[in-house]
Amino acid sequence: MRIVTIIGARPQFIKAAVVCRAIRQMALQGAEIEESILHTGQHYDYTMSELFFHQLDLPAPKWHLNCGNDMQRMKASIQPILEAERPDIVIVYGDTYSTLAGAETAAELGIPVAHIEAGLRSFNPTMPEEHNRIKTDQIATWRFCPTGTAVVNLHNEGITEGVFHVGDVMYDAACIFTPKEEKQLSIIRQYHLTAKEFAIATIHRAATAENTEALSNIFIALSQLPMPVLLPLHPHTAKTVEHNSTLQVLLEQATNVQVVKPVGYLEMLALERLAALIITDSGGMQKEAYFQGTPCVTLREETEWKETVEAGWNHLAGTGSQGILDAIHMPFSRQHIEEYSDGHSAERIIHILYEDVNR
């Protein structure tokens, strides 16, 4: 079985890492299976890309396209590669432009697509990610769902075949890669932080990172927290701040907010584990907060990870200053979530694909 995996953004590197491990494990057990990685270049700087490959022991990409966020350029670059390779399966992850570009190009060439993290819905049609998810699920042959809710979403859209509830590969990754306690403490000491006495905040979605009013409100709210806040600034957010003097002043006046460059995955896991609170607009970090036992406030009005809200680990706050502060001070009930499975989701995915292709 020959696989081409198409990835391009940080969350996809994490998910692909555990699936790559499962593929290597099957190959060592004698299965005829090989994988080649195509990196679209959607995340292109060192911390957002190469560092993750190094930390996660991901094989070097066979192809690196440097396409940025240009989906049509991605498709034009992916097409000749898939035509030459003719893999049995193309694997795509999540909801980025790389996801949809890979899925559409493979489908146009008659190559079956496996969508990992299928069936998620925020029910916000203005989000590009929502469009990418829906289109990719319509194209895919195999739809690997992290939760029962995702399965129900697909069934409600009339998609019932090729749907598998396998658990969450991000939980696999957290189980494998979370640093030991001593390493966690050494990481937070680099930032002069004390365990469970700081918040970690991230802002990266275009709807937030390119919205100066939203960023102003968020920075004002962060400045009013009664604890230090570590803010690894995503390149998109940093670019907006760089071109807006008001945002720069707000950050300078927020004396409790420590702005740093983006951190690697292992560092982020340690920071999440030892933080008192996570504040984010990231989908993945909402789950990681639960995996690491840390409450989360999400800077959005809706989420595709409804289980985290229903179980009392995650409050939806939007981007208004008062809404954020209110959410921070609301109690978190922190109930157990069964949905994310047992840390062996990647193995289940590869076994299903291998059995189907070799029938």
Task: Please provide the spans of the model-predicted regions.
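Active-site and donor-binding regions of nucleotide-sugar-utilizing enzymes
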Residues: 4-7, 13-30, 51-54, 64-158
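N-terminal beta-loop-helix "entrance" segment that forms/cooperates
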Residues: 41-59
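Donor-nucleotide binding loops and adjacent catalytic segments primarily
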Residues: 42, 50, 182-274
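A nucleotide-sugar donor-handling region in carbohydrate enzymes
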Residues: 43-47, 66, 139-211
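Nucleotide-sugar donor-binding patch of glycosyltransferase catalytic domains
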Residues: 56, 290-336
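Short acidic-hydrophobic, aromatic-tinged amphipathic segments that line or gate anion-handling sites
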Residues: 63-67, 145, 164-165, 258-261, ...
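A donor-sugar binding/catalytic signature common to diverse glycosyltransferases
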Residues: 92-93, 100-103, 115-116, 143, ...
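Leloir-type glycosyltransferase catalytic cores
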Residues: 149, 315-359
